[in-house]
UniProtKB/Swiss-Prot annotation:
Its EC number is 4.98.1.1. It comes from the Bacteria. This is Ferrochelatase. Keywords: Cytoplasm, Heme biosynthesis, Iron, Lyase, Metal-binding, Porphyrin biosynthesis. It comes from Pseudomonas putida (strain GB-1). SUPFAM superfamilies: Chelatase. Belongs to the ferrochelatase family. Catalyzes the ferrous insertion into protoporphyrin IX. Fe cation binds at residues 189, 293.
Length: 337
């Protein structure tokens, strides 16, 4: 075995559906300053308030989608890992989670102990955000530095508009899009608008604009999560030949009362149901593996909401998961990282 490892990193999951495990996971996740970007005392107070009721609610939600093998996100990421092995001849292929297990610092330490000296770090997030990509990269760097690990790292950059990534999305979604449907909703994970504003070098960018940062400079486009989501959606729609008016974009998973990027998925589901859309397809391209946000939030609660608003059927298009075309594309992008 050679000394160059591929490390696939995803968000993470509770160890089980117990309230205690969910509380422990939510505490680690929400206390990350890249997730809730408030001063520590304020963040600690806010998270403590959230943890009064949220763990029980989330435990129920996780229980509704939990598989016999465990968390869908972790199981699917392990399947991706297994498929990637034959495409990565340079050394071991491992997975790590930013929150929960297998923990990123421990995986890095284990790789170093095995004689690995180079790591290609692949945050499994197509679009850039501090709360996803940056927190993974910074924790990896901090771990290597503080523990004195003899590891050289290179990082897979966000690939939101990479033609091969768009092709993989198309290949995985095509069987669903070849069926009759009325509308396609591309629902991305949302972010507080302030997360984007603090990265705006101009200070005057309009994060509600329909084309967002399309005409902004390269510096802004590299960090504008909303603009990257819109670019993914547009490239996908063009690839599939979906006419304007038959697809739209929204942002899900809003937490708290702060202003998040819009339009909100909940509002869009109501609008589409009331507008006469009967069969709605929903894709979630911010996620490469199905998880609670896709399976429960959209596939269950979102479906109920859409039907209550007048729709007939919501069909959740699976994420890329371990689709063969995605495996090939990811391996190629990691090879060139």
């Amino acid at each position: 075995m050679t000394d160059h490892a591929l490390l696939l990193v995803n968000l993470g999951s509770p160890a089980s559906t117990s309230v205690a495990d969910v509380r422990r996971y939510l505490n680690q996740f929400l206390m990350d300053p890249y997730v809730i970007d408030l001063p520590w005392p304020v963040r600690r107070l806010l998270v403590s308030l959230i943890l009064v009721k949220r763990p029980e609610q989330s435990a129920h939600a996780y229980g509704s989608i939990w598989w016999e093998e465990g968390s869908p996100l972790v199981v699917l990421t392990r399947r991706l890992q297994a498929a990637m092995v034959e495409h990565w001849p340079h050394g071991p292929v491992e997975i790590a989670m930013r929150y929960g297990q297998p923990a990123l610092p421990e995986v890095l330490e284990r790789l170093a102990a095995q004689g690995v000296r180079k790591v290609t770090l692949a945050p499994l997030y197509p679009q850039f955000a501090d709360s996803t990509v940056t927190t993974v990269v910074e924790l990896a760097k901090q771990t290597v530095s503080e523990r004195g690990l003899p590891l050289q790292m290179r990082v897979l950059r966000p690939f939101y508009d990479h033609p091969d990534y768009i092709e993989a999305l198309a290949a995985s979604a095509r069987p669903y899009l070849e069926q009759d449907y009325d509308h396609l909703l591309l629902s991305f994970h949302g972010l507080p608008e302030r997360h984007l504003k603090k990265l705006d070098p101009t200070g005057n960018h309009d994060f509600q604009a329909a084309d967002c940062c399309k005409d902004a400079g390269a510096e802004m486009r590299a960090v504008c999560y909303r603009g990257q989501c819109l670019a993914t959606a547009k490239a996908f729609a063009q690839k599939m030949g979906i006419p304007d008016g038959k697809w739209s974009v929204s942002f899900q998973s809003r937490l708290g009362r702060a202003k998040w990027i819009e339009p909100y998925t909940e509002a869009r589901l109501d609008e589409l149901g009331k507008a006469g859309v009967k069969k709605l397809l929903v894709m979630c391209p911010a996620f490469v593996a199905d998880c609670i946000e896709t399976l429960e939030e959209i596939g269950m609660r979102g479906s109920e909401q859409f039907v209550e608003a007048g729709g007939r059927e919501l069909v959740l298009v699976p994420c890329l998961n371990d689709h063969p075309e995605w495996v090939r594309v990811l391996a190629d992008m990691c090879e060139k990282a």
